[in-house]
Every structure is written in structure tokens, then in C-alpha cells.
Design a protein with these regions (language model features):
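Polybasic, lysine-rich low-complexity intrinsically disordered segments
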Residues: 5, 10-13, 28
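Sequence-structural signature of the catalytic-core scaffold of metal-dependent phosphohydrolases
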Residues: 16, 31-57, 69-80, 89, ...
Length: 476
């Protein structure tokens, strides 16, 4: 009897132990898979305590879109360089037209994927899954808001001012994390700051966007300490806690351990924002290069025609014969190629939904397309790097951008560090009150300078540079 009792107790303990281990495993598993119901939230950042469900024609995500369209930072994109110099007699893309086109493609991707997912998961019909298109569309509008003047060369100019220029002298005065933010300055991280930071005199939560829209623009969900050679990261040290709050609310998987620089998996909709951007900049840069005669008509047609199957080519060629205008032919081919890419990226997302939700999917959707379409896209990329991004006009913009931005940063940082100097007072008086140039820390002061300069248009930055150098005076 004693042996039987001991045996029963052992069995009972083992059963309890097994149940405990099994429950822990289930808990870990549930934490390592994101779910759509939690990922799509219309809660507004900064107004959580006042969250209410409004029964009106516009959804919260459509409100995000409208809020961005009517904002001053969005309007300023019309005077910021995309790739080519801002238009003379030939109109090419600027940041505003690019963002609007990315938003359209993002909406198409989102709507197509929402329809496929609802068919695949009918149990989610009562969720916000059908609104993916609206979320992605709004996030696409916002994706370039943080970019400084003069295109990507503006980003490089800010980073290299601190890593190679006069700003290097400030390194001993800043923490390692603060220094990484400055030397790896990133437009995506700056967009997240612009949308969430409470600037002087503004309401808490910045733009007060929905959690899902904000999460969808964070392409690199980790801190600057993990930026590496690609110089990419998703949020500055000052907004790290804000992103953590959003990630936890939406159930985004945390990949870093306690004590390590933070890293999260991407919100699934980031892949759609990224794909829309990849599709638009590549396809539109080719068309712009044709308008500027950097690429011949034959070269341009050959690049676009690679995207179509033989059966589709027959119809494409028939339609092109009906159009006499060469630019219209190119526009039609570009539109058709974008359609092919949207369909291909939609298929990749739906096929890899499980890996995307558990945070193991790697690379952009573009890299996972079927080989013929992927090869056609890569051929466009190779041509762009060989002939477009190294063209004289593009390089001239980079050279001018470096000079203008580094000069402005140098003078403004000197001014906020020594605000009692006479010249410093003149410079600081030009800065809008919303920028915290009198912040208590050096990091805060530098961020205020970068907020001010990154918000400038190309024309404003150039005009200020000329005035500071005495090359331009206001009309009397």
C-alpha cells in the first residue's frame, strides 16, 4: 500500500509538472505569434484616456489620412527633392507627388490583401481587417515626412556632420545612445518623432494618430545602437518608450532580451508600406529619367516590357500602337508594370502570412516575388544606379545639400549652446517657438536644431543659407 501511495504521488507530481510546462509553452507560443485583432487598433496615441468609438462616416484610419493631407509638414513635401532637382520646364517627382503615389499603391495592396485574408479567415469578419487599405494608405502618406531637404543626401549630410565633421567635437558630451542617434540620423526615425513628439505648445501625442498607422511606418523597429552599416533604425532614444508602448499594445513580438538595445519584429503592414515605396520610386524614377532624356525611349520601353508574360505582351503592344504620344506610351507601360508588381507582392504576403505573423519573414516582399518579375525589377534597379542616381544633376543636388545643411547645423548648434551671444540671439529668433532650443540637455538642444532643419524645404534652406552668408538680402 505504501509503494502504491508513493507511486500515485509521483504520478500526480509529474502530471502537475507536465501541465505547468505545457502551459508555459502555450504562453510562450501565444506571445511569439501576432494576431490581426490586436494588430489593428484604432486607439489614438496621446488620447488613450479619451478613446471613444465614433459612429460616423469616416473611420479612424481615414481620419489619419485626412489629418496628414491637411498638415503643414505634408504640404512642405511639395518643395523637397525626391531624386532629381525640383522642376524647371520639365516636371518630375518631388516628395509630395511621390508620397501621394505611394499612398495609392499602398491602398491597392492593402485592399487586395484584406480581401484575401478575410476569405482565408472568415472568423475575422468582425475585426478591422477590412480597413488595412486605409491604414497602409495613411502610413504611406507619412513615410517621408521626416526626410530633410535635398533628398537622401540631406540625411547623409546630417549624419556625417557628427561622424566626420565639426560635430565630432560633441561626442564626449553625449551618451553612447545619443551619439548613435546623431551619427546615424534617419528619415524614418525622424518621421516617427514628428508624428508622436509633443512639440512646444502642441497637444500630447503629436499628430495623435492611431496606433496601427504609427506602427506601420516603423520600417526598422530597433534602436540606433543596432543601426549597423546600413545606417537604418526606427526611433530615436527620445521616442523609444513611445514605440515600446505602441508595440506592447498591438502585441508586436519583442526580439531583444532585457538589458539589450531594443528590437521588435515588424508590424505586418510595414511590409506593404515598404513594397508600395519600392514599387513607386523604382517605376517612377525610370519614367522621370526618360522625360529628362537620361534614358532613351528604347531603353525605357525595354525595362518596362520585361514585367509582362508573352500573352500579356501581345495586348500591351496592341494598345501602344493606338497611342501616338511617346510619353503616353511610357506612362501606360509604367502603369501596367505597377499593376504586375502589386499583384506579385500581394501573393507573396498572403503566401507568407504565417512567417510574417511570427516575425521570421526576412527581407522586403519585392525580394520574394517570382523570378521573372524579380529579375525585371532588379534590372530597373541596376539601370537606376548606373545611369540615374549618378547623373550630373543628381550629384549636383547632393553637393549643394551637403554644403547648405552642414553650414546651417554648425551655426544653429553653436547658437543653442551659447544662446547669450549676440549672433546666437539673431539665429534663435528665426526658429519657430515649437522647437525646444532651450531644452535642459545638450541632446535635447541638438534635436531641436535637427527638428528645425529637417522640417525645411529645399528652397527655404537655400534661402536661409544665402542670407546667413550675406549672398542674399530681403527686398527693401
Amino acid at each position: 500500500d505504501l509503494h502504491k501511495t508513493i507511486s500515485k504521488l509521483k504520478t500526480k507530481k509529474l502530471t502537475h509538472l507536465f501541465v505547468f510546462i505545457f502551459s508555459l509553452s502555450l504562453q510562450k507560443l501565444s506571445q511569439s505569434v501576432m494576431n490581426w485583432k490586436q494588430l489593428i487598433s484604432n486607439k489614438r496615441f496621446g488620447l488613450e484616456a479619451l478613446h471613444e468609438i465614433r459612429k460616423e462616416d469616416r473611420t479612424e484610419f481615414q481620419r489619419d489620412y485626412d489629418r496628414l493631407i491637411f498638415s503643414a509638414p505634408f504640404r512642405r513635401l511639395q518643395n523637397k527633392t525626391q531624386v532629381f532637382p525640383l522642376p524647371g520646364s520639365i516636371f518630375v517627382h518631388n516628395r509630395l507627388t511621390h508620397s501621394l503615389e505611394v499612398s495609392c499603391v499602398g491602398r491597392s495592396l492593402g485592399n487586395d490583401i484584406a480581401a484575401s485574408l478575410l476569405q482565408k479567415h472568415p472568423e475575422l469578419s468582425d475585426s478591422h481587417l477590412s480597413e488595412i487599405g486605409a491604414i497602409v494608405s495613411a502610413a504611406c502618406l507619412a513615410h517621408d515626412l521626416g526626410n530633410p531637404p535635398f533628398g537622401h543626401s540631406g540625411e547623409k549630410a546630417i549624419g556625417t556632420y557628427f561622424s566626420e565633421g565639426k560635430g565630432l567635437a560633441l561626442k564626449p558630451l553625449l551618451s553612447e545612445a545619443e551619439w548613435e542617434d546623431l551619427t546615424h540620423f534617419e528619415g524614418n526615425a525622424n518621421a516617427f518623432r514628428l508624428l508622436t513628439h509633443q512639440f512646444e505648445g502642441r497637444r500630447p501625442g503629436g499628430f495623435v494618430m492611431t496606433y496601427s498607422t504609427l506602427a506601420s511606418i516603423v520600417k526598422y523597429p530597433f534602436s540606433s545602437r543596432l543601426a549597423g552599416k546600413k545606417q537604418k533604425f526606427g526611433f530615436f532614444l527620445s521616442e523609444e518608450e513611445d514605440y515600446k508602448r505602441i508595440a506592447e499594445e498591438l502585441g508586436i513580438i519583442k526580439l531583444s532580451k532585457d538589458g539589450e538595445p531594443i528590437r521588435y519584429a515588424r508590424h505586418p503592414l510595414v511590409y506593404l508600406v515598404e513594397a508600395a515605396d519600392d514599387i513607386c520610386y523604382q517605376m517612377m524614377d525610370i519614367e522621370d529619367a526618360h522625360k529628362l532624356k537620361i534614358l532613351t525611349t528604347q531603353e525605357t520601353k525595354e525595362l518596362y516590357l520585361q514585367f509582362f508574360t508573352e500573352s500579356r505582351l501581345k495586348r500591351i503592344n496592341e494598345i501602344c500602337k493606338l497611342v501616338a504620344d511617346t510619353n503616353e506610351q511610357i506612362a501606360y507601360l509604367r502603369t501596367s508594370a505597377i499593376g504586375v508588381l502589386i499583384k506579385a507582392c500581394t501573393q507573396v504576403f498572403v503566401d507568407n502570412e504565417e512567417d510574417i505573423l511570427n516575425g521570421t519573414f526576412e527581407g522586403p516582399l519585392i525580394k520574394h516575388m517570382d523570378k521573372p518579375i524579380r529579375q525585371a525589377y532588379e534590372n530597373c534597379s541596376k539601370t537606376a544606379f548606373a545611369k540615374i542616381y549618378c547623373s550630373k544633376d543628381v550629384l549636383d543636388i547632393e553637393l549643394a545639400g551637403y554644403q547648405v545643411i552642414t553650414t546651417l547645423i554648425d551655426l544653429m548648434i553653436e547658437a543653442v549652446r551659447y544662446p547669450d551671444k549676440a549672433y546666437s540671439k539673431l539665429l534663435i529668433n528665426r526658429v519657430s517657438k515649437q522647437y525646444e532650443v532651450h531644452a535642459p540637455t545638450l541632446y535635447g538642444k541638438i534635436q531641436a536644431v535637427l527638428d528645425y532643419i529637417s522640417g525645411m524645404t529645399d528652397v527655404y534652406a537655400l534661402d536661409l543659407y544665402r542670407k546667413i552668408n550675406g549672398n542674399s538680402l530681403p527686398a527693401v
